[in-house]
Amino acid sequence: MTEEATAQQPPVPGMTGPRRAAVGFIFITILLDMLSIGMILPILPKLIESFSNDNTADAARIYGLFGTAWALMQFVASPVLGGLSDRFGRRPVILLSNLGLGLDYILMALAPSLGWLFLGRVISGITSASISTAFAYIADVTPAEKRAAVFGKVGAAFGLGFIIGPAIGGLLGGVDPRLPFWVAAGLSLCNALYGLLVLPESLPPERRSPFRWKSANPVGAVRLLASNSRLAAMAVVEFCAEVAHVALPATFVLYTSYRYGWSETKIGLALAFVGVCTAIVQGGLVGPALKRLGERNAQIIGYGGGALGFLIYALAPTGALFWIGIPVMTLWGIAGPATSGMMTRLVAADQQGQLQGAMTSVKSIAELIGPFLFTLIFAYFIGANAPFALPGAPFLLAGVLLSVSVLVAATAGDARQRVPAG
């Protein structure tokens, strides 16, 4: 990514030049991370299926176990890395995470068996804190009242990565199913080198806090979320949304391949379209939506759009109708930045890293539950023992969970007051 590309990122009102540049660095870091992840997304489930004698139900169960193992490692490691980022700074944690991700992709590119693939996912889970630390980085350099908008701008990197990544991954996977892993490894390692050379530290020594195992363990980190009733309510909203979100990576590839007969290339293009819609929402709609609707209404509309999108996914009888659900689903993108912005104002300045570590733990708990839950439901409802065939059952459950997020967001207290530094 060039300096010109960085300069093209929209300026954020109320931010100085150095702060805008720092957010630009984080934008590129997240973009390269998501590009790498997006490249292997259409391929990994099919690679597992090839190790499972092309049995879709068995591959779904194994893929769910892979996702659960990855989330377990992230759940244990993320609070530790969040606490370390509060103590030693964000930069070393981000660099370590990118290095680990690159090694993970190399291992998977060489994996001769499911066991080696599994080991690669374990390594990735341990070092997967770069996103949460990147959000803590943003909290360091962004005024509290501007954070939701900046989270939305940086969130566009997720969409851009998923525009390019799945399309490239699908095309490369058509040549060789291992090739996307090699390219993803190269991108991740280049990202680590990029950060080593140009990424400045965002947390000055005077704002750092001591590392405490009590807060760094997963239970201690999550305990922060119970310190405030509004924070706890937002954590419930985020937890339900995170569990629902797991339905997409857990079953999207296997579902569309099984129900509509899509190839890796077509799946990659569909995921790229998801990325296009996400980038439009995150990059163009989040700021105006937050300004016009307010954070709570943005949550309600966003999570509600996601629930409707899941309903379309579950019931669409043809692939053409499934495509209609994609832009509806991506309205969900206006809800996440609103929730993140509200939560950062409910903790002190020296707890931002701990908050992001805690929220990563919440996400990890969701990802512990979600992959196995959704793939098991999918495998059951396409199996011979199901009372009726319903391959879209995982998406129906995800829609119910997002409806819970809507209900809690609509009834929770406001989050306008910022907690003073303690």
Give the ranges of each region predicted by the language model.
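Juxtamembrane intracellular "pre-TM" segments in multi-pass secondary transporters
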Residues: 8-20, 200-237, 259, 422
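Short amphipathic helix-loop junctions that connect adjacent transmembrane helices
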Residues: 43-60, 250-267
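Conserved MFS/SLC helix-loop-helix module at the cytosolic interface between two early adjacent transmembrane helices
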Residues: 75-114
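Helix-to-loop junctions at the C-terminal end of transmembrane segments
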Residues: 77-89, 281-295
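Cytoplasmic helix-loop-helix junction between adjacent transmembrane helices
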Residues: 120-159
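A membrane-interface helix-boundary motif in multi-pass transporters
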Residues: 173-186, 376-400
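Multi-pass alpha-helical transporter architecture, strongest
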Residues: 192-198, 396-422
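C-terminal transmembrane helical hairpin of 12-TM major facilitator-type secondary transporters
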Residues: 296-339
